[in-house]
């Protein structure tokens, strides 16, 4: 929250403002004497100030409602030249300013637990201050205003802080019921406008606080899901970035009424993104397992196509080089080659067929022999460097 306040301070210095409420008669003179200076425009914003109850010109009064703790309120004196009025709320060691000024960009900051809507002034007597304070506490909008403020405090707060805020709210309501304070319809339009504007400002402030925190938590949950999906391959235990208490957003955007209507917070069960895929896979395996098994066996029986053994190829190439002019082995030669290479005759036939297609072209003499009707395999004698019969005897060159 401190980082967020620092960021908002930086933005305000750059001329950026949030939640501007302007009205000629919106709370500018509320609780002040008729002789005070009129302001042309009133803007309400929260501005961080440095600690304590604050000094400066002005008096400090203590207001206390029946059954409540004292409330410190301070007004800083201003002049008509500045047109500037500040409502300062003090609580513990921190102080925040609700400013009503002209020409200054509004900046939203965290409110304190016991915020006030009045300022002391030299022109107001103690009786008048008590009367104004009683009007604010008795205003019908005061309960909603307090609830909106506590919702802002819940945003991003740890679970123990959220619990303390809920207890404080319940104690306040109990004191209000025991004191018998009635909240009749307000007859002060100026006070109505001030309470309504302040309530709207707190609601918008809560929305601005909730949005970045919710987006950050959604992003971390997506990262958590992706990491768990990657870890499922290694059977790793589920990864949780948020603890169970943090996973409930620590009171983000939740009021006491919302928690009561929901019957308490319940942890959303984790959804395995791969459960549906695994279920489909198991169903297909059960349905087609028999067919897949038979297909696997059939494929395993088939020999993969590959090259012949190196030694066998070398012996076939040696025979090829010796019989290049007529590379047609006889049946007896095929049997001999099969025995020497360890191949069957089908493999030998296929090898010679492919080898002749790729690397052999008949000579002109062989082409004439084929054209004359002399089958080469039946030729008992072929001169010009070829073999006689089975090729064991060779004639002269």
UniProtKB/Swiss-Prot annotation:
Keywords: DNA-binding, Homeobox, Nucleus
Positions of region (Disordered): 43-68, 172-191, 233-276
Tissue expr: Expressed only in the stems.
Protein localization: Nucleus
Domain ELK stretches: 279-299
Ranges of biased composition (kind: Gly residues): 49-58
Cross-referenced InterPro entries: ELK_dom, HD, Homeobox_CS, Homeodomain-like_sf, KN_HD, KNOX1, KNOX2, TALE_homeobox
Family: Belongs to the TALE/KNOX homeobox family.
Protein name: Homeobox protein knotted-1-like 2
